[in-house]
Amino acid sequence: MELKTMPHNGANGSPQHNNNNNSNNNNNVSSDTKTDNNEKEAQKKDEGRTNWSNGIEFLMSCISVSVGLGNVWRFPFTAYENGGGAFLIPYIIVLFLIGKPMYYLEMIIGQFTSQGTVKIWSICPSFVGVGYGQAFATICIITYYSSLLALTLYYLFVSFQSELPWSYCRDEWTNCVNSIPTEFVETALGNTTSALAQQANTLSNTTKLQSSSELYFLNVVIKEKSDISDGIGIPDWKLTIALFVSWVVIFLVIMRGVKSSGKAAYFLALFPYVVLFALLGRAVTLEGAVDGIIFFLQPQWGELLNPIVWKEAVVQCFFSLAVGCGPIIMFASYNRFDHGIYRDAMIVTTLDTLTSLLGGITIFAILGNLAHNLKAENIRDVVRSGTGLAFISYPDAISKFQAVPQLFSVLFFFMLFVLGIGSIVALQSTIVTIICDQFKSWKYWKVALATSACGFLMGLVYVTPGGQWILTLVDFYGGTYVVFILAIFELSGIVWIYGLQNFCDDIEFMSNKNVSMYWRLCWSFFTPVMMIVIFIYSMATIQPIKYSDQYFPLAGDVAGWLLFAVGAAQFPLWGWWYIATHRHGSCAESIKASLKPSSKWGPASPENRQAWLLFKSDLAAKRANEAKSNKFGFFQQKLRNMCGK
């Protein structure tokens, strides 16, 4: 939607008359000399906050974190589990009514305050638990994302072998079908194709066939356990080394902060598309690929009434855009105050969706070919859903490249590693920033080192034979639902408690543009109501989670709910803590005061802050005069505000 230019602001986003009332504005900031000095000292620190070298670096950084594993890894298997093409319709609807509004809101709040995901809650201090709860969910996501990096690195290393190890069957895999093309098998392995084909035909009548890429992943790489009732096993030493190397890379990138990440973002954001388009070009030429693409794109209208599909669409949108976790707020906080983020928000959200569709079409083209090779009647039968999909179907496609598949495999898994690094660096930077904001004397690189070491230790649980079970559990309880409920509190705290009009006034001051009706309606009604309805219904109809069509043991479900409780409890616990430590008369008065912006709320720069206070004061006086001059002025003003006029 268009944003209309406001005539009363300067080009830099500050009012043109901001220099006439400096002494009055200083008195408005604080009436206490000591408090005023403390705020000035804090403002000096914030004024010296590092900015991006240019706007393109910020845009590329947002692309690198939003266009990542969520698109190439999570979106295909989420669509796979929710009816293929049926998932696209709710996903696109959710994108426009929830994803884009939330993404734009987080960009705005970060740039306006120049603060991280916890410090922004000076807007509504008793909601500070939202920031800490999101940090908890971010830690959960980081731990299992890093295990995916370990798997990616493992595949990258073995891709240097003379023959891709997942492209052929082992003798002990009696239900195996080679992932490598038949004609290439004849060339590389001799005249054994007819015997293998005869064996496959015989087995297909009695046993479910599995591709060699799937069996390699399950039996060789993760050594998956079919049941975790007796424990998850011990970490695999090869994956442990890969996990350690991954965290070393993460630390080396993160220890320098955002100063150098903007330069790396060009490569992190653009390189993956080269490999993705090449893989797509190969995938669509495979036999059966059209059937897979049709399955992906053909909508099943009945699924639109399934609230679980809508819930998964919201969760996928959040994971894909990195909404509700903090990186977008953190990145935007390093922008100049007058940076035009509207364009960036639209570019990133649109590109993110197109990348998800690109990844989905590619993976389903491969699944269609797998179904053709395994003589499966239904594409859903060719491979199990779950986190292993990207490590089964993508390698299967790579093995079909007859011209130097090893080279393409190296490029692909390096691309996947780059995508993962881009995502985790942003998430990890969010955690390090939160800690450094609370303990300003701590060295950034030391905090980065400590958090990286903790991330490695926590990631060890995912490289055990039962690691994929734990990943599913943590993703569901520690990531999905915690992010979901805290995003509802985030939006309600900003739009309903602080107030839609107050928030839109702040946007107008910062951007020198009016906020259109689309954003106002989404923020005030459509986005929060949809999220609340979907969350309540999904919780009321929640079913015990499964992995590989098997239910978790009771202990697993209990652990999962405890994980969710810890994340969700951050909101009320920190709210109670703030109210208890900031008493203002009675309990009711203290609660009411905790819902009002603190003296720290507003732009970090002293000049922008003074201009903002004057801007808000002028608007309040103008609206009061309009309400007095017209009997229905109050209601007319409310209507104009909602319409963005």
Swiss-Prot record:
Annotated region described as Disordered, given as residue ranges: 1-48
Spell out which residues lie on the membrane's Cytoplasmic side.
1-51
Q: Which residues are glycosylated?
A: 191, 205, 514
Q: Which UniProt keywords apply?
A: Amino-acid transport, Glycoprotein, Ion transport, Membrane, Sodium, Sodium transport, Symport, Transmembrane, Transmembrane helix, Transport
Look up the record and give one Gene Ontology term from the biological process aspect: sodium ion transport
The keyword Metal-binding belongs to this UniProt entry's keyword annotation? no
Q: Which Pfam families match?
A: SNF
SUPFAM superfamilies listed in its UniProt record: SNF-like
Q: Provide one Gene Ontology cellular component.
A: plasma membrane
Composition bias, Basic and acidic residues: 33-48
So where does this one cross the membrane?
52-72, 85-105, 138-158, 234-254, 264-284, 313-333, 347-367, 407-427, 454-474, 480-500, 522-542, 559-579
InterPro entries recorded: Na/ntran_symport, SNS_sf
Q: Biased-composition ranges for Low complexity? A: 18-32
The membrane topology of this protein is: Multi-pass membrane protein
Instruction: Provide the GO MF annotations for this entry.
Output: amino acid:sodium symporter activity; D-amino acid transmembrane transporter activity; L-amino acid transmembrane transporter activity; neutral L-amino acid transmembrane transporter activity
Q: Does the keyword Glycoprotein apply?
A: yes
Location in or out of the cell: Membrane
Q: Where does the record place a coiled coil?
A: none
Q: What does this protein do?
A: Unusual broad substrate spectrum amino acid:sodium cotransporter that promotes absorption of the D isomers of essential amino acids. Neutral amino acids are the preferred substrates, especially methionine and phenylalanine.
Q: Which family does it belong to?
A: Belongs to the sodium:neurotransmitter symporter (SNF) (TC 2.A.22) family.
What protein name is recorded for this chain? Answer: Sodium-dependent nutrient amino acid transporter 1
